[in-house]
């Protein structure tokens, strides 16, 4: 009896573990399947040039290439194994195959989102790819040197040595007048400094004499 109960509990535990293990596998697949089956490829091409969108589809798989405008998809070409291709999308010049398409004579309006969808023989979706195409505008044409005309105008001026000397001589008194005391000669500066020193010395002597006289001659108050 006890052995039957223990075997029953073991069976229940194993079944629960199996269910839990399968649940974890399904959860992992649900999380990572969109990443595996869908990716974004960024491509760019020059304006007026060509660009090729390459897929990982094999030649024995049918492929549907389309352009996405944000709300709806427009079929570019449908490559069906053994039946060739069709290009119903107006405005694109391209060559189409299962593993790639090439868009010729790119314009700025060709920038946008493109998609590729591959099918197996049973019709099931094998993989899905997104392409983000950016068409780079042509650089602005620069003007060559031969097409540029340079106009040079000259103004005749006559400057003599004598006139330059006269002009400099006439400016000298004005500069000295503006500078004032600083532009005087060293001899004049020394004379002024000596006079200032004598005046200050005499003033100090007078102040000292007056101070002593007031101190000696004043009568003390009783």
UniProtKB/Swiss-Prot annotation:
Chief subcellular site? secreted
Localization recorded for this chain is: Secreted; Host cell membrane
Any one GO BP annotation for this protein? symbiont-mediated suppression of host dendritic cell mediated immune response
What does this protein's UniProt record list under function?
A: Plays a role in modulating the host immune response and affecting host cytokine production. Structurally and functionally homolog of host CEACAM1, induces endothelial cell angiogenesis. Ligands for host FLT3 receptor, activates the PI3K/AKT and MAPK/ERK pathways. In turn, triggers hematopoietic progenitor cell and monocyte differentiation leading to virus reactivation.
Q: How does it sit in the membrane?
A: Single-pass membrane protein
Q: Which organism is it from?
A: Human cytomegalovirus (strain AD169)
Q: Which residues are glycosylated?
A: 50, 56, 60, 71, 105, 109, 125, 132, 147, 164, 168, 189
This one is known as: CEACAM1-like protein UL7
Which keywords belong to this entry?
Glycoprotein, Host cell membrane, Host membrane, Host-virus interaction, Membrane, Modulation of host dendritic cell activity by virus, Secreted, Transmembrane, Transmembrane helix, Viral immunoevasion
SUPFAM superfamilies per the record? Immunoglobulin
Q: Which Gene3D superfamilies match?
A: Immunoglobulins (2.60.40.10)
Looking at the UniProt entry, the stretches that span the membrane are 193-213
What's a GO cellular component annotated to this UniProt protein? extracellular region
- Which domain of life, per UniProt? Viruses
Please name every pair of cysteines joined by a disulfide bond in this record. none
Entry PTM: Highly glycosylated.
Subunit note: Interacts with host FLT3.
Family designation: Belongs to the RL11 family.
